């Protein structure tokens, strides 16, 4: 099997901490595996504007789910060896996977597909997915802090709440609760929560989940959410591709989410094609692209696996950190 190494100029010897695999090489890793999802599953998991199909699942996500299952099994073996060494019987904690990437890059679809596929592997029937949207400050609080135009930037999140949530899950808490976010009202839903009860695997999906810890007020380094990840994935693509995907999704939302009377963006439902494109590109240039360049893209090198997409949303390259 042919495997090439990604070269970097950061190291004098030209070595890289990543192994680079092209689509063809990666797909061969699942040649003998049975496809666990059917067309109905894929239709249900597909995101708006994301042309996920059976071929993509078989060639990309099937080998990825197998790789993740190997990591989960290895963590179980390490837990058993550690408890034997310590002479103490401690309960195994959930395996936590982080999925990061830009708005509109398709990370939510990838997270949903991985959840469904990992549920079908032996040993991990209970797989939960949490998005960091639930840890955005409520709209009223964002307005009070003058952060509405910075929604999605690191400062718009309750980072302490997110860190506490992941820490408690990783610590083995029987039940952990998170706020519920509505993409229709664009706000936290009062009185509604996401409840996670000791899953085998927890997938945490969001823009900034790979961000490093910020220095504390006392000058000491704090903890980052990614400190609790057992595996992390960054979904990558050219910025120009992501912009087009964002604009395309915005157009389609006019007849779906935006069309609902209770939608925060209901005013956009009647925009013409030209006005919709102009509005979407304005939002992209003003908010999403700066956030990508300043906060999201710089975390790419912190991931254990980088999935690079082509203009048609298909994964064309994988960079896997060497063990």
Swiss-Prot record:
ATP binds at residues 101-108. Pathway: Cofactor biosynthesis; coenzyme A biosynthesis; CoA from (R)-pantothenate: step 1/5. Transmembrane segments: none annotated. Its EC number is 2.7.1.33. One of its GO terms (cellular component) is cytoplasm. One of its GO terms (biological process) is coenzyme A biosynthetic process. It catalyses: (R)-pantothenate + ATP = (R)-4'-phosphopantothenate + ADP + H(+). CDD domains: PanK. It is found in: Cytoplasm. Its main location: cytoplasm. InterPro entries: P-loop_NTPase (IPR027417), PanK (IPR004566), PRK/URK (IPR006083). Keywords: ATP-binding, Coenzyme A biosynthesis, Cytoplasm, Kinase, Nucleotide-binding, Transferase. The keyword Transit peptide does not apply. The keyword Nucleotide-binding applies. One of its GO terms (molecular function) is pantothenate kinase activity. Belongs to the prokaryotic pantothenate kinase family. HAMAP family: Pantothen_kinase_1. This is Pantothenate kinase. It comes from Paenarthrobacter aurescens (strain TC1). The gene is coaA.
């Amino acid at each position: 099997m042919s495997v090439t190494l990604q070269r970097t100029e950061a190291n004098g010897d030209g070595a890289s901490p990543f192994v680079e695999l092209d689509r063809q090489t990666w797909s061969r890793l699942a040649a003998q595996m049975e496809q666990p999802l059917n067309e109905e599953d894929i239709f249900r998991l597909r995101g708006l504007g994301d042309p996920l199909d059976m071929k993509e699942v078989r060639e990309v996500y099937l080998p990825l789910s197998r790789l993740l299952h190997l990591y989960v099994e290895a963590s179980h073996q390490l837990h058993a060896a550690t408890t034997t060494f310590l002479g103490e019987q401690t309960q195994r904690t959930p395996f936590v996977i982080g999925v990061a990437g830009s708005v509109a890059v398709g990370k939510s679809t990838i997270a949903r597909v991985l959840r469904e596929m990992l549920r079908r592997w032996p040993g991990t029937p209970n797989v939960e997915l949490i998005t960091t949207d639930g840890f955005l400050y409520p709209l009223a609080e964002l307005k009070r802090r003058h952060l509405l135009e910075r929604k999605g930037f690191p400062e718009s999140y309750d980072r302490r709440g997110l860190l506490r949530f992941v820490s408690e899950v990783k610590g083995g808490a029987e039940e952990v609760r998170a706020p519920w976010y509505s993409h229709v009202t664009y706000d936290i839903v009062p009185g509604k929560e996401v409840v996670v009860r000791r899953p085998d695997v927890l997938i945490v999906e969001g823009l900034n989940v790979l961000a490093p810890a910020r220095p504390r007020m006392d000058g000491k380094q704090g903890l980052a959410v990614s400190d609790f990840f057992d595996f992390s994935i960054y979904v990558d693509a050219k910025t120009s591709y992501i912009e087009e995907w964002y604009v395309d999704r915005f157009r389609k939302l006019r007849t779906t989410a935006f069309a609902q009377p209770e939608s925060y963006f209901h005013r956009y439902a009647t925009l013409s094609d030209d006005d919709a494109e102009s509005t979407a590109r304005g939002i992209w240039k003003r908010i999403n692209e700066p956030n990508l360049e300043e906060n999201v893209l710089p975390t790419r090198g912190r991931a254990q696996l980088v999935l690079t997409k082509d203009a048609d949303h298909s994964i064309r390259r994988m960079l896997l950190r060497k063990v």
